[in-house]
Amino acid sequence: MAGAGQTMPDGRPTPTGLEVPRWISLKSSHVRARQGPGLDYPILWEYRAAGLPVQVIAETTEWRKVCDPEGAVAWIHRTVSSGRRSVFNNTDAEIPIHAGKSQTSPVRARLQPRSIVSLDECEDGWCRVRARRLEGWVVQRAVFGAQSRA
């Protein structure tokens, strides 16, 4: 698959054929972050937030080197990640979720600090997000995980 045309930041082809950097999310609330790409490397910490968006900054066939909302970098196994997109409010302030793509559009809800919601799409500086039955728009730059590239 490496011949799919995608490359890592240093120009090498990616093992998966997917773009690097790219956004993924954590599948479970127990994801071990390791110092290197393999079970022989020490566990640095454990992520406890299913759906947390992280950015893949390098990869091997089985492992993904990711950067999290705090800027920490570690390796996770491919099986604990998902291609589903999500965003995270990594600020101490609530982020308004609007009915439409406008600051003047009615506020449907507020994304609480340290909260995760599903990401549907981003356009014109706005991202459509979902949480349970709620759907709305947030300013793209206000959330972690919505940027198109590093």
Regions picked out by a protein language model, each given a short descriptive name:
Residues 2-35, 46-50, 57-60, 67-101, ...:
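SH3-family beta-barrel domains
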